[in-house]
Curated annotation (Swiss-Prot):
Organism of provenance: Chlamydomonas reinhardtii (Chlamydomonas smithii)
Region annotation Disordered: where it falls in the sequence: 65-111
Stromal side stretches: 137-198
GN (gene name): PETO
Function description: The cytochrome b6-f complex functions in the linear cross-membrane transport of electrons between photosystem II and I, as well as in cyclic electron flow around photosystem I.
Protein's name according to its UniProt entry: Cytochrome b6-f complex subunit petO, chloroplastic
Main location: plastid
TM segment ranges: 116-136
Subcellular location: Plastid, Chloroplast thylakoid membrane
Family statement drawn from the similarity comment of this UniProt entry: Belongs to the petO family.
Keywords recorded for this protein, A-Z: Chloroplast, Electron transport, Membrane, Phosphoprotein, Plastid, Respiratory chain, Thylakoid, Transit peptide, Transmembrane, Transmembrane helix, Transport
One Gene Ontology term, aspect cellular component: cytochrome b6f complex
Amino acid sequence: MALRCKTPAATCAARSRRSVRVSAHKGAFEQAQVAAAAFVAAAVIAAPANAGVVLQQPVLKKAFQDDTPAAPPPKREFRGLAPPALPQSDAPNVAAEKPKKAEVVESTSGGLDPRSVALPGALALTIGGFVAASKIDGSFNDWFMEAVVRDSNNYAGYEATLKSENGVTFPKVAAGGTKKVKAATGSKKGGFPFGGKK
């Protein structure tokens, strides 16, 4: 301390005893949050949204393959009995190589995409057709309700126990039971007491 301070020792001691005051204002954290949110909103709004369509496909590289074609395997000749060779034609094969067509990518610049109108248009057409049919024919609403809403009093057609006059009827339990059932239930009658006392 003596090396740094060339003034009297009392002044150096006073400087080293300085205290730092830290005060927090109410709402400082909220102000920082609002400032950060405003900065992010300004950055997002100001950034251009270039969601363009890529019209050319990138050329893919073959990482694990050589660019040179593989050498053809050597021909093995059989010098014994060989079938006769067919005559070779000297004319080049015209249909062998066809020129490749360039890929055409169509994009709609501007305008309205039909897919964004299809579902709302179909819903509007259906509801509009229903309203028009009900205005033209007064009995259309009755016919529609009869066709769509099923009367639940008829059930599905196969619930014989539900259609009976007494409502649901349970089958009767046989009076006697096997010895194992009687022993398992602990009753002399046997069976399980489903519908109350027996």
